[in-house]
From Swiss-Prot:
Its EC number is 4.2.1.9. The gene is ilvD. The active site is at S517 (proton acceptor). InterPro entries: Dihydro-acid_dehy_C (IPR042096), DihydroxyA_deHydtase (IPR004404), DiOHA_6PGluconate_deHydtase_CS (IPR020558), ILV_EDD_C (IPR056740), ILV_EDD_N (IPR000581), IlvD/EDD_N (IPR037237). Belongs to the IlvD/Edd family. Homodimer. This is Dihydroxy-acid dehydratase. Functions in the biosynthesis of branched-chain amino acids. Catalyzes the dehydration of (2R,3R)-2,3-dihydroxy-3-methylpentanoate (2,3-dihydroxy-3-methylvalerate) into 2-oxo-3-methylpentanoate (2-oxo-3-methylvalerate) and of (2R)-2,3-dihydroxy-3-methylbutanoate (2,3-dihydroxyisovalerate) into 2-oxo-3-methylbutanoate (2-oxoisovalerate), the penultimate precursor to L-isoleucine and L-valine, respectively. SUPFAM superfamilies: IlvD/EDD N-terminal domain-like, LeuD/IlvD-like. Mg(2+) binds at D81, D123, K124, E491.
């Protein structure tokens, strides 16, 4: 029988000092010998996706204690990518993922915790905690803060749905009045929760369902809805059950690495492709797989992207649907159900509920079940009231959306496209691959050939776009923004948004060794690997070079003679593969991150060969 990890600090006379300190935290005599469960919270007033989490940790803790465990809460940091966007703050976003993973490991191992509940929500917090969970491999349940309600406003006598990206695009659109821009800004983000589209935060919270590490509805039930409270309560109960099964019954099938195995990672990636999720999820799944010691690579992603259709289109890929609509259509269990019926899912994987994925789909897929409680849960909808309070409303749709022909979620037969929502491209410009969200690319530019216009930083690219330097037909190349070159691999949401603001959204392509926000759409190709700072060919591109992009054939090519490229490479070798005339202060902390960072095809994790 596995011994409780916490026994190291709670048993024996030699641990009298540790027990004295445990008592000072509130533990009683009969608590020693119970599993000590870390409640890993991420509350902060900086982030709307986390502003409502202050009391969630204790909500979970009380359930843990009712079920027979001892709960101890601590907090991690949380960066708001939207607020950090467009300035030097974005350099810190991706590095914070690894810092979160390390901080969770430090706290859990230092205090010998037996299990944990991870309360996450936004872009780097869920993947950071996921990396920690798979690294530690102790019983764990994920529960997130939930999505924000979509914004709504009336413009030109028409009610329109909004999100953060609309505020950014229209704020830079010279054809939009100051009054309309201000109205959109005030209406775009009405409640607490992770931004309302299928951006990175919501994508990752959805993927935890496919990985089997969170409960059904975790990715889609609104932050404001009363139904979400039950997810927190159930997480507290379930983690104690997992502890009993592992520590008392010697059942290691409940551990994160047993649940999130190779098949589960393939399920998560298939879900991501089917729902047109954020390209950042590729980065995070690759990183998490390495923590789990799962052999999951860009080659697997390429293979899956050629098999899985696009079954759901949500903002930013359309303004018709947001996360509240995904929930009404049955949430992630519904998309997984459609993938299962198309024989595109490993349904024998396990979940934290102790079920196989097939059993969980049968119970929670609204197309399969007649259970009124399940249908009621997925009818949970928005209230349209500005608030920062969780569980503050109980509004419901009259019906669920089970239309698999024309609804938010579709069957394979009626898919938005038989080609999936994400694709990996390769060629001389990206020998180790690059990623594009095909769900956000207009059909007219799936094949695109244009002249390169090169920028050595995101800031210069923004100035070039807004200043009129970028013209229709250009391939905007933004380099030295990768994990090493940034350092920190900034998101390029402002450049892609400003291309739309300037009317160039369907007339230009953008290629970068940086990454994109989940809010990005258009012909935006990121994660170019190897990155410029690692000697990638993107570092050799010059203004006017012809670049050919062919998404259907998964190809990206720089049309320059090999002899010329060899000469350019020799010049860069002398220069040390550094950006030219870039004005950027880089802190010591970021330099450390950049020194150890691998390229995006490896998940931008630390290079262990350098340690």
């Amino acid at each position: 029988m596995p011994k409780l990890r916490s026994a190291t600090s709670t048993q024996g006379r030699n641990m009298a000092g540790a027990r004295a300190l445990w008592r000072a935290t509130g533990m009683k005599e009969n608590d020693f010998g119970k599993p000590i469960i870390a409640v890993v919270n991420s509350f902060t007033q900086f982030v709307p996706g986390h502003v409502h989490l202050k009391d969630m940790g204790q909500l979970v803790a009380r359930e843990i204690e009712k079920a027979g465990g001892v709960a101890k809460e601590f907090n991690t940091i949380a960066v708001d990518d939207g607020i950090a966007m467009g300035h030097g703050g974005m350099l810190y976003s991706l590095p914070s993922r690894d810092l979160i993973a390390d901080s969770v490991e430090y706290m859990v191992n230092a205090h010998c915790a037996d299990a944990m509940v991870c309360i996450s929500n936004c872009d780097k917090i869920t993947p950071g905690m996921l990396m920690a969970a798979l690294r530690l491999n102790i019983p764990c349940v994920f529960v997130s803060g939930g999505p924000m309600e979509a914004g709504k406003t009336k413009l030109s006598d028409k009610i329109i749905k909004l999100d953060l990206v609309d505020a950014m695009i229209q704020g830079a659109n010279p054809n939009v009045s100051d009054e309309d821009s201000a109205q959109i800004e005030r209406s775009a983000c009405p409640t607490c929760g992770s931004c309302s589209g299928m951006f990175t935060a919501n994508s990752m919270n959805c993927l935890t369902e496919a990985l089997g590490l969170s409960l059904p509805g975790n990715g889609s039930c609104l932050a404001t809805h009363a139904d979400r409270k039950q997810l927190f309560l159930d997480a507290g109960k379930q983690v104690v059950e997992l502890c009993k099964r592992y520590y008392e019954q010697e059942d290691d099938s409940v551990l994160p690495r047993s649940i999130a195995n190779k098949k589960a990672f393939e399920n998560a990636m298939s879900l991501d492709i089917a729902m047109g999720g954020s390209t950042n999820t590729v980065l995070h799944l690759l990183a998490a797989a390495q923590e789990a010691e799962v052999d999951f690579t860009m080659a697997d992603i390429d293979r899956l992207s050629r098999q899985v259709p696009c079954l759901s289109k949500v903002a930013p890929n359309t303004q018709k649907y947001h996360m509240e609509d995904v929930h009404r259509a049955g949430g992630i269990m519904a998309i997984l159900g459609e993938l299962d019926r198309a024989n595109l899912l490993h349904n024998d994987t396990r979940t934290v509920l102790g079920m196989s994925l097939a059993e969980q789909i049968a119970k929670y897929d609204i197309v399969l079940t007649k259970d009124e409680a399940v249908h009621k849960f997925f009818r949970a909808g928005p209230a349209g009231i500005r608030t920062t309070e969780a569980f503050s409303q109980d509004c419901r749709w009259d019906t669920v959306d089970d239309d698999r022909e024309n609804g938010c979620i579709r069957s394979k037969t009626f898919a938005y496209s038989q080609d999936g929502g994400l694709a990996m491209l390769s060629g001389n410009l990206a020998m180790d691959g690059c990623i594009v969200k095909t769900a956000g690319v207009d059909e007219s530019i799936l094949k695109f050939t244009g002249d390169a216009i090169v920028f050595e930083s995101q800031e210069d690219a923004v100035a070039g776009i807004l200043g009129g330097k970028v013209q229709a037909g250009h391939v905007v190349v933004i380099r030295y923004e990768g994990p090493k070159g940034g350092p920190g691999m900034q998101e390029m949401l402002y450049p892609t948004s400003y291309l739309k603001s300037m009317g160039l959204g369907k007339a230009c392509a953008l290629l970068t060794d940086g990454r994109f926000s989940g809010g990005t759409s258009g012909l935006s190709i990121g994660h170019c690997s190897p990155e410029a700072a690692a000697g990638g060919l993107i570092g050799l591109v010059k203004d006017g070079d012809k670049i050919e992009i062919d998404i259907p054939n998964r190809s990206i090519q720089l049309c320059v003679a090999e002899e010329e490229l060899a000469q350019r490479r020799a010049e860069q070798d002398k220069l040390g593969w550094q950006p030219v005339n870039r004005q950027r202060e880089v802190s010591f902390a970021l330099k450390v991150y950049g020194h150890f960072a691998t390229s995006a095809d490896k998940g931008a994790v630390r290079d262990k060969t350098k340690i």
